[in-house]
């Protein structure tokens, strides 16, 4: 089973870090694909440094930047021999999206449960059409080498999920737990959209809300 948790994406397509092997056997490289699409179906993006603000992995407390070449597919292909949990983190450079009508943006804010967005928009004196949005994309994934022991941590992204469950060593009968952060604080009572993919590739989407401590 593969889970993707999402809270902010102002466009129809999501971005996620994927892999053909989240538990690669000994001697094989850890390969991470940068995917863009919907419901786990999408294009495998090439690596371009002008689209990447930061791209790194951490294992056993040691951080390493991904040093891919322009146009590389997959975006990350690294030989990692040490055992343990590998946390891969990606942040894009900013992109600009123009809305020519309010309706398209309204669909987004309704879907993402931002009820105060219109009031905030108009109170700033912004127009209801022809306005622009700047957005970043953030994505993390967990890979296991060998025993897969280890834990996720907060890397200081503007918004991020921090896994509180290690899916490779913890009992998943109790579920997978994560904590959502925005800035330096847990984000409470936020809608979380979850995409769940089973081993056969079937995808189910459902919604949860974070608690008072940002946990879901």
Give residue ranges: language-model regions.
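Start-of-domain marker
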Residues: 11-68
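Beta-strand-rich domain onsets/edges
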Residues: 11-30, 114-177, 181-190, 198-203
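Short amphipathic beta-strand segments in non-cytosolic proteins
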Residues: 53-63, 191-209
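Glycine-centered loop-to-beta-strand initiation motif
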Residues: 72-75, 206-216
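Short, hydrophobic beta-strand segments
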Residues: 76-81
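Short acidic/polar inter-strand loop motif in beta-rich domains
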Residues: 92-101
